[in-house]
Every structure is written in structure tokens, then in C-alpha cells.
Amino acid sequence: MARLCAFLMVLAVMSYWPTCCLGCDLPQTHNLRNKRALTLLVKMRRLSPLSCLKDRKDFGFPQAKVDAQQIQEAQAIPVLSELTQQILNIFTSKDSSAAWNATLLDSVCNDLHQQLNDLQGCLMQEVGVQELSLTQEDSLLAVRKYFHRITVFLREKKHSPCAWEVVRAEIWRALSSSANLLARLSEKKE
């Protein structure tokens, strides 16, 4: 796992420079990586969702905070960055490596890390050193609370296979929402 984290950090440094210097084309690059991560998440499924019905939980995804009708791109970037960082935190935790196929997990983490670099590069370009607005702070807090509930759920369920399956499906939904947000923002630009 330590090698995986070191590898991801090297990728972060290597991919940060082109993102900043080539300009921000976030909807195109991010959506491609997001779609690949979604596909990999489907492949990671180890249990039938039907066998884990008793473990299902509503984590309260902050849909209003990632709704393109209510959020501008400059506001969306910090929220999507936080969402991606939190997903990456879950999948790089020591307990996740025992739950998933190592090759698929590495691929998902690599894609998430590249997405995070894209988002952070755009954040630096668009926001610079400006402070976050109260709306952005509220949105970031909602995302953090959402992922805290997921982390607590995993801990309470002792990182059981069904708990991981529920979380995998929930993360798939969260990534799908971020893809929809970016698609709508991209349409607004055109």
C-alpha cells in the first residue's frame, strides 16, 4: 500500500505541471477519467447488491450542492475537488486494500488522483488565492459531512464485505452526480 501511495504522489507531481500550463479544459479531461472510474467501480463489485439489502443506508448525498442549476463552474470546482479527494481517501485507506481486487483498486485510485490534479489545476487558475465564499464553504462542509457518515458506517460495520459493497455503490452515485454536473456546466459554456 505504501508503494501505491508513493506512486500516486509521483503521478500527482508529474501530472500537475501539464494541467496548469496547457490551460484548463476540465470538462473534457475530467469527464473521460470520471467515466473510466465509473466503469472500474462497476467491475469492482464483488457481491450481489441483493445480498446486502440489510446494510443499505441513505448517507444523505448533498445533491443540492452539486446541482448545475444552483452552482456556477467557479463554485463547482472546489466542491468537485473535495468530493474527489474524499473518495480517494476512502479507497486509499488501509482497510480498502483488503476489500478489493488490487489491480482494479489501483486503477480507480490512479484515475481519481488524475481527476483531483485536473480539478486542483483549474482551481488554481480560476480562483487563484481568493477566499471561498460562504456558499462554497457550506457546500464543502456538506460534502465532508457526507463522507464522514460513510466512514462512520464502514467503521460501525467493521469494514464488512457488504459495507464495502454499499459504499462502492454510493461512491458510484456520487461520481455519477459529479459527471452530470460537469456535463451541464459544459453545455452552459457552449
Curated annotation (Swiss-Prot):
It comes from the Eukaryota. It is found in: Secreted. Pfam families: Interferon. CDD domains: IFab. Glycans are attached at N101. Residues 1-23 form the signal peptide. One of its GO terms (cellular component) is extracellular space. InterPro entries: 4_helix_cytokine-like_core, Interferon_alpha/beta/delta. Disulfide bonds join C24-C122, C52-C162. PANTHER family: ALPHA-INTERFERON-RELATED, TYPE I INTERFERON. Produced by macrophages, IFN-alpha have antiviral activities. Interferon stimulates the production of two enzymes: a protein kinase and an oligoadenylate synthetase. This is Interferon alpha-7. It comes from Mus musculus (Mouse).
